[in-house]
């Protein structure tokens, strides 16, 4: 196990888990409109399921309004259906080839359920980070057993992997707290 390469690879994989977590929580709705809210929406189009952003353009014309411009007029109904069925609590209004989506005020119950979803995303990210840590530790044990590295070097590297894991998990916790505040802000 070459120390620099594998630690860099572990760090890259942990950073990937953070990036995925950031993407997940960006799609959670707060009091402000954001095109990311519609990221989880998929549409039945051309014989398969496609992400909404592959059949339409999403903009934020007003703080509490989303606008979806469907590229193919024949897809407007499918886009509306996909948004309604997405369990986001949104009711699009068809306006020609566009859909206007007013964002209702978030009530306390909905805010709490969004916080719960954010916690689930955080836990998923932490599990991914722990898997990366386990892979790193297993690699160190194997290298130590094969005689590629000494016991002291193995212990030193495993401490660095653990430190990297702890820092990455604390980054996830910090991002989660920030998102919680953003969601609960009235």
UniProtKB/Swiss-Prot annotation:
GO CC annotation terms, alphabetical: cytosol
CDD domains the record matches: RRF
Any GO BP: cytoplasmic translational termination
Disordered, as annotated region: 140-163
Keywords of the record: Cytoplasm, Protein biosynthesis
Location(s) in or outside the cell: Cytoplasm
Pfam families linked: RRF
GO molecular function per UniProt: ribosomal large subunit binding
Domain of life: Bacteria
This protein's record includes keyword Cell cycle: no
Role summary: Responsible for the release of ribosomes from messenger RNA at the termination of protein biosynthesis. May increase the efficiency of translation by recycling ribosomes from one round of translation to another.
Family that this chain belongs to: Belongs to the RRF family.
NCBIfam families xrefs: frr
Record protein name field: Ribosome-recycling factor
Native source organism of the sequence: Rhizobium rhizogenes (strain K84 / ATCC BAA-868)
């Amino acid at each position: 196990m070459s120390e620099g390469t594998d630690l860099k690879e572990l760090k890259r994989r942990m950073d990937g888990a953070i990036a995925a977590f950031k993407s997940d929580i960006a799609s959670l709705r707060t009091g402000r409109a954001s095109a990311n809210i519609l990221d989880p929406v998929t549409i039945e189009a051309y014989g398969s399921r496609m992400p909404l952003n592959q059949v339409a353009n999403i903009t934020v014309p007003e703080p509490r309004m989303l606008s979806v411009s469907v590229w193919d007029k024949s897809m407007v109904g499918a886009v509306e259906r996909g948004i309604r069925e997405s369990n986001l609590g949104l009711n699009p209004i068809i306006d020609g080839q566009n859909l206007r989506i007013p964002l209702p005020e978030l009530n306390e119950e909905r805010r709490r359920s969004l916080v719960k979803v954010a916690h689930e995303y955080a836990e998923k990210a932490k599990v991914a980070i722990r898997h990366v840590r386990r892979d790193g530790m297993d690699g160190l044990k194997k290298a130590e057993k094969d005689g590629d590295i000494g016991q002291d070097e193995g212990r030193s590297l495993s401490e660095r992997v653990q430190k990297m894991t702890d820092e990455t998990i604390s980054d996830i916790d910090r991002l989660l707290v920030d998102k919680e505040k953003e969601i609960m802000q009235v």
